[in-house]
Amino acid sequence: MKKIVSILFISAVCIILFINLPWKQALVFEEGRTKQQVAYLPMADGDAFDIIFVHSIHLTDVTESYVVTGQQIEQKMIRFSQYGIGMPAEVHEGERYEYKDGMHHLYVNDVYFDSMNIRNGKTVSNHRLVVKRRGERERQLQFNDYFVPGDWYAVSIQKLSLWQLWRGVEMR
Protein backbone atom coordinates (compact mmCIF):
# COMPACT_ATOMS: atom_id res chain seq x y z
CA MET A 1 0.00 0.00 0.00
CA LYS A 2 2.81 2.42 0.87
CA LYS A 3 4.40 1.70 -2.50
CA ILE A 4 1.18 2.61 -4.37
CA VAL A 5 0.78 5.84 -2.39
CA SER A 6 4.42 6.75 -3.06
CA ILE A 7 4.03 6.07 -6.79
CA LEU A 8 0.82 8.14 -6.93
CA PHE A 9 2.45 10.98 -5.01
CA ILE A 10 5.55 11.03 -7.23
CA SER A 11 3.35 10.83 -10.35
CA ALA A 12 1.22 13.76 -9.15
CA VAL A 13 4.32 15.86 -8.43
CA CYS A 14 5.75 15.04 -11.88
CA ILE A 15 2.48 15.99 -13.60
CA ILE A 16 2.26 19.26 -11.68
CA LEU A 17 5.86 20.10 -12.55
CA PHE A 18 5.35 19.14 -16.21
CA ILE A 19 2.28 21.33 -16.76
CA ASN A 20 3.98 24.31 -15.07
CA LEU A 21 7.28 24.24 -16.98
CA PRO A 22 7.71 27.02 -19.57
CA TRP A 23 7.03 25.32 -22.88
CA LYS A 24 5.82 27.45 -25.79
CA GLN A 25 6.91 30.96 -26.79
CA ALA A 26 4.07 33.39 -27.43
CA LEU A 27 3.15 37.02 -27.88
CA VAL A 28 1.21 37.59 -24.66
CA PHE A 29 -1.37 40.30 -23.98
CA GLU A 30 -1.92 41.09 -20.29
CA GLU A 31 -4.50 43.47 -18.86
CA GLY A 32 -2.55 46.64 -18.08
CA ARG A 33 -3.56 47.14 -14.46
CA THR A 34 -3.91 43.58 -13.17
CA LYS A 35 -1.30 41.88 -15.38
CA GLN A 36 -3.78 39.05 -15.92
CA GLN A 37 -3.22 37.20 -19.19
CA VAL A 38 -6.02 38.07 -21.63
CA ALA A 39 -4.82 36.39 -24.82
CA TYR A 40 -1.76 34.91 -26.45
CA LEU A 41 -0.49 34.15 -29.93
CA PRO A 42 2.21 31.47 -30.42
CA MET A 43 5.23 33.13 -32.07
CA ALA A 44 8.69 31.74 -32.80
CA ASP A 45 11.96 33.59 -33.11
CA GLY A 46 11.94 35.51 -36.40
CA ASP A 47 8.14 35.58 -36.75
CA ALA A 48 6.74 39.04 -37.50
CA PHE A 49 3.59 41.00 -36.79
CA ASP A 50 2.12 44.40 -37.55
CA ILE A 51 -0.14 46.47 -35.35
CA ILE A 52 -2.42 48.68 -37.44
CA PHE A 53 -4.45 51.42 -35.79
CA VAL A 54 -6.46 54.39 -36.98
CA HIS A 55 -4.89 57.68 -35.91
CA SER A 56 -7.48 59.41 -33.74
CA ILE A 57 -6.98 62.88 -35.27
CA HIS A 58 -6.48 62.44 -39.01
CA LEU A 59 -8.34 59.08 -39.10
CA THR A 60 -5.88 57.22 -41.33
CA ASP A 61 -4.14 53.89 -40.76
CA VAL A 62 -0.78 53.78 -39.02
CA THR A 63 1.18 50.52 -39.25
CA GLU A 64 3.92 49.54 -36.82
CA SER A 65 5.96 46.46 -37.82
CA TYR A 66 7.73 44.17 -35.35
CA VAL A 67 9.80 40.96 -35.31
CA VAL A 68 10.20 38.49 -32.45
CA THR A 69 13.87 38.44 -31.46
CA GLY A 70 14.55 36.04 -28.60
CA GLN A 71 12.44 37.19 -25.66
CA GLN A 72 12.12 40.71 -27.08
CA ILE A 73 9.99 42.58 -29.59
CA GLU A 74 12.07 44.40 -32.20
CA GLN A 75 10.46 47.36 -33.95
CA LYS A 76 11.32 47.49 -37.65
CA MET A 77 9.15 50.13 -39.32
CA ILE A 78 6.39 52.72 -38.94
CA ARG A 79 4.18 53.51 -41.97
CA PHE A 80 1.68 56.37 -42.10
CA SER A 81 0.08 58.67 -44.65
CA GLN A 82 0.00 62.01 -42.75
CA TYR A 83 2.17 63.73 -40.22
CA GLY A 84 0.38 64.59 -37.02
CA ILE A 85 0.49 64.39 -33.25
CA GLY A 86 2.35 61.27 -32.19
CA MET A 87 3.91 60.64 -35.60
CA PRO A 88 7.71 60.76 -36.04
CA ALA A 89 8.81 64.19 -37.27
CA GLU A 90 12.49 63.54 -37.95
CA VAL A 91 14.89 60.78 -38.90
CA HIS A 92 17.47 59.87 -36.27
CA GLU A 93 20.86 58.24 -36.72
CA GLY A 94 20.49 54.64 -37.85
CA GLU A 95 16.98 55.21 -39.24
CA ARG A 96 15.96 55.39 -42.88
CA TYR A 97 13.05 57.37 -44.33
CA GLU A 98 11.26 56.62 -47.58
CA TYR A 99 8.16 58.11 -49.22
CA LYS A 100 6.57 55.45 -51.41
CA ASP A 101 3.07 54.95 -52.84
CA GLY A 102 1.72 57.96 -50.92
CA MET A 103 2.97 56.63 -47.58
CA HIS A 104 5.76 57.69 -45.22
CA HIS A 105 7.97 54.74 -44.19
CA LEU A 106 10.39 55.09 -41.28
CA TYR A 107 12.69 52.08 -40.91
CA VAL A 108 14.30 51.81 -37.49
CA ASN A 109 17.24 49.76 -36.19
CA ASP A 110 18.08 48.46 -32.75
CA VAL A 111 14.75 49.32 -31.12
CA TYR A 112 13.88 46.48 -28.74
CA PHE A 113 11.13 46.16 -26.17
CA ASP A 114 10.87 43.71 -23.28
CA SER A 115 7.23 44.77 -23.23
CA MET A 116 5.06 47.48 -24.76
CA ASN A 117 1.84 49.10 -23.65
CA ILE A 118 -0.97 49.25 -26.20
CA ARG A 119 -4.35 50.90 -25.74
CA ASN A 120 -7.20 49.44 -27.75
CA GLY A 121 -8.90 52.42 -29.37
CA LYS A 122 -12.16 53.58 -27.81
CA THR A 123 -13.33 56.50 -29.95
CA VAL A 124 -11.93 55.02 -33.16
CA SER A 125 -11.73 51.34 -32.34
CA ASN A 126 -10.27 49.56 -35.33
CA HIS A 127 -6.94 48.14 -34.13
CA ARG A 128 -5.72 45.12 -36.05
CA LEU A 129 -2.95 42.59 -35.60
CA VAL A 130 -1.40 41.19 -38.78
CA VAL A 131 0.34 37.89 -38.05
CA LYS A 132 3.29 36.87 -40.25
CA ARG A 133 4.51 33.50 -39.00
CA ARG A 134 7.03 31.63 -41.12
CA GLY A 135 5.48 28.87 -43.18
CA GLU A 136 1.95 30.25 -42.75
CA ARG A 137 -0.28 32.56 -44.70
CA GLU A 138 -0.47 36.13 -43.39
CA ARG A 139 -3.67 36.79 -41.46
CA GLN A 140 -5.35 39.73 -39.77
CA LEU A 141 -7.05 39.70 -36.36
CA GLN A 142 -9.33 42.41 -34.96
CA PHE A 143 -8.38 43.68 -31.48
CA ASN A 144 -12.07 44.09 -30.61
CA ASP A 145 -12.56 40.32 -30.96
CA TYR A 146 -10.26 39.85 -27.94
CA PHE A 147 -9.93 43.16 -26.09
CA VAL A 148 -12.20 45.78 -24.54
CA PRO A 149 -12.20 49.12 -26.45
CA GLY A 150 -10.45 51.79 -24.38
CA ASP A 151 -8.49 49.36 -22.18
CA TRP A 152 -4.72 49.09 -22.26
CA TYR A 153 -2.60 45.99 -22.40
CA ALA A 154 1.02 45.05 -21.76
CA VAL A 155 2.40 43.03 -24.68
CA SER A 156 5.51 40.86 -24.34
CA ILE A 157 7.16 37.66 -25.51
CA GLN A 158 6.91 34.95 -22.86
CA LYS A 159 7.40 31.22 -22.55
CA LEU A 160 4.04 29.82 -21.45
CA SER A 161 3.47 26.61 -19.54
CA LEU A 162 0.87 24.05 -20.58
CA TRP A 163 -1.31 25.32 -17.73
CA GLN A 164 -1.14 28.91 -19.05
CA LEU A 165 -1.88 27.69 -22.59
CA TRP A 166 -4.90 25.68 -21.43
CA ARG A 167 -6.47 28.48 -19.44
CA GLY A 168 -5.61 31.30 -21.85
CA VAL A 169 -7.34 32.52 -25.00
CA GLU A 170 -5.37 31.75 -28.15
CA MET A 171 -5.80 34.40 -30.82
CA ARG A 172 -6.92 32.64 -34.01
Where do the model's predicted regions map?
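N-terminal hydrophobic targeting signals that begin at the initiator methionine
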Residues: 1-3
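Hydrophobic membrane-insertion alpha-helices, especially the h-region
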Residues: 5-22
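Alpha-helical transmembrane signal-anchor/signal-peptide segments
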Residues: 25-37
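Extracytoplasmic/periplasmic/luminal assembly and interaction segments
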Residues: 50-90
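Mature, soluble, non-transmembrane domains
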Residues: 89-172
